[in-house]
Amino acid sequence: MQTSQKHHSAAGLHMLYPQVYCSPQFQAKDNKGFSDIPSKENFFTLESSTASGSLPSYDSPSVSITSGRSPFSPQGSQSCISDLHHSPDNVYGSPLSGVSSLAYDEAGVKSKIRELEVSLLSGDTKVEEFSGFSPAAGKSWNWDELLALTPQLDLKEVLVEAARAVADGDFATAYGFLDVLEQMVSVSGSPIQRLGTYMAEGLRARLEGSGSNIYKSLKCNEPTGRELMSYMSVLYEICPYWKFAYTTANVEILEAIAGETRVHIIDFQIAQGSQYMFLIQELAKRPGGPPLLRVTGVDDSQSTYARGGGLSLVGERLATLAQSCGVPFEFHDAIMSGCKVQREHLGLEPGFAVVVNFPYVLHHMPDESVSVENHRDRLLHLIKSLSPKLVTLVEQESNTNTSPFLSRFVETLDYYTAMFESIDAARPRDDKQRISAEQHCVARDIVNMIACEESERVERHEVLGKWRVRMMMAGFTGWPVSTSAAFAASEMLKAYDKNYKLGGHEGALYLFWKRRPMATCSVWKPNPN
């Protein structure tokens, strides 16, 4: 444990210092929800959608998310959805009944998740968009002819046809399409050409049964820690995805701990600890003095490699800042994967108000479809047993956990097309740093989702509708994201491309690229029952 009474040098540590935005004052949550969000050009709601389910225009004057600020309960609505991928126009709204029971039931969780999965995949319009093309009746593919036509082919169609052949076990056709794809993709091309490079690599790895080997190779052939940190910094600066997580969670945490004198934050993806630099500075301004702040950070191997050392570096950096700000500070490390965490690893002490932060990490926890241990739900029940004041959950809005291979491939194609477009808006296509950042920080995840299965597939995203089921079954009640957090996120987005937007639905805050939801922030409290 480090305390702020010991002076530690923070030189040469984390490069990803967060420029986190907040409202001028952090006030206790009122009963207005998102009733008055500044910067309305950056904000729209899902509630104002038409009956057909299409999203409203981005300059919609309506910014109301909830009619009341009180917590919404499972009984408040029979809809547990947040899937915005139900049609090409992001139609949302897929009823899921019977989620009112909060008593944990493993079979019940599986049943509700399966029910939602069926609802999401029924009439899978994303796959149906690619109706397929085929050679003339009774003829086989003429690959030489197809290669000659590559300038006229739609790259997305070719990618999906290759994936369809893989799914059907038609290896000859799959390899034929991969040869065509080699002539169409480029790491320095358009967003779809760059993405196509990595998706084709994933397909080839799956065909050759070397998915896990290639995934491990990508991990083993990483650049040096300093280089990787540099590439991570590039993505951090040109895309708002991590700042969205840090900004919204920090505002929610500050509001939740107002008036507390002893605060314990447990972060399951603390990475470089950047989020808490801002938090410490804000706590130092608290009227009447700051609380004693205790932070438990859970580690992962990638963060250890990137920062060039263990969690002690994070603790030293935060302790140094806390001391300079006059904030009493303690740091506890849990050097292990999140799925291995037990209660005794968290450094709990009596008398602390506990807050738990899950930033883009729960999707790495294996669930009931992977392991009988079901660490995803086990961890949520562990957190519930701590009686936290607040749990913040930020995740990618994508459905790749249990969907069949072809549906998963098309979902990955859709999601990462938007991500690569958003990166493209910030850096030139021939920018070497951008190319390296995509190769070393994004490609590995894509290959893992396409090439690997069972326990070796660690990228298992779920849409908020599924997280809602899991949180409710674990004994949590959803709580609307505050006006202050929405304001802070809106202010943060002013530094980015105008195609980034905010939206809200059932109390959660969504980050969009154009019409595609990319990430969600939701807030949870233990059910009093």
Curated annotation (Swiss-Prot):
Compositionally biased spans, kind Polar residues: 51-81
GO molecular-function terms, A-Z: DNA-binding transcription factor activity; sequence-specific DNA binding
Places the protein is found: Cytoplasm; Nucleus
GO CC annotations on file: cytoplasm; nucleus
Tissue: Expressed in roots, hypocotyls, cotyledons, shoot apex, leaves, flowers and siliques.
Key words of the record: Cytoplasm, Nucleus, Transcription, Transcription regulation
Motif mapping: VHIID: 263-267
Residue stretches making up the GRAS domain: 146-525
UniProt-annotated stretches for the region SAW: 451-525
Protein name as it appears in the record: Scarecrow-like protein 13
